[in-house]
Amino acid sequence: MKNNISKFPLSFSKSAIKKIKTIISEKNIPNLKFRVYIAGGGCSGFQYKFKFDKNKNKNDTIVNIFNNIIIIDPISLQYLRGGQIDYIENLEGSKFIILNPKAKHTCGCGSSFSI
């Protein structure tokens, strides 16, 4: 089994790290990870997606940061490398966002992008 461990293909804001750790701690599920991935859709062609996942797939990359709790599939990684994940709270609500230098266009909500 291939074990891909990457040193910081993405950066994470302090607020994102804090929120990820808090949610994982509250769920109290052994080996729970934060999965970051790209899916087709949205108004710009691709969408950023996040979910908490116990399963690591064979070709997933583990981001070697704060106890290896971030996983990314290889296709999503090529679109996300060099980006930053942040967690924001404002009057509209709270959410994880990605600041992606590879995105040529983003929609107004910040959830979808094109390359």
From Swiss-Prot:
Pfam family, one: Fe-S_biosyn
Coiled-coil annotated spans: none
Residues reported in the UniProt entry to bind iron-sulfur cluster: C43, C107, C109
GO terms of biological process kind: iron-sulfur cluster assembly
UniProt key word Nucleus: no
Keyword Iron-sulfur in record: yes
SUPFAM superfamilies xref list: HesB-like domain
Cofactor(s) annotated in UniProt: iron-sulfur cluster
Cofactor note: Binds 1 iron-sulfur cluster per subunit.
InterPro entries: FeS_biogenesis, FeS_cluster_insertion, FeS_cluster_insertion_CS, FeS_cluster_insertion_RrpA, HesB-like_dom_sf
Similarity section: Belongs to the HesB/IscA family.
Subunit text: Homodimer.
Protein name: Iron-sulfur cluster insertion protein ErpA
Organism listed in the record: Buchnera aphidicola subsp. Baizongia pistaciae (strain Bp)
Lineage: Bacteria, Pseudomonadati, Pseudomonadota, Gammaproteobacteria, Enterobacterales
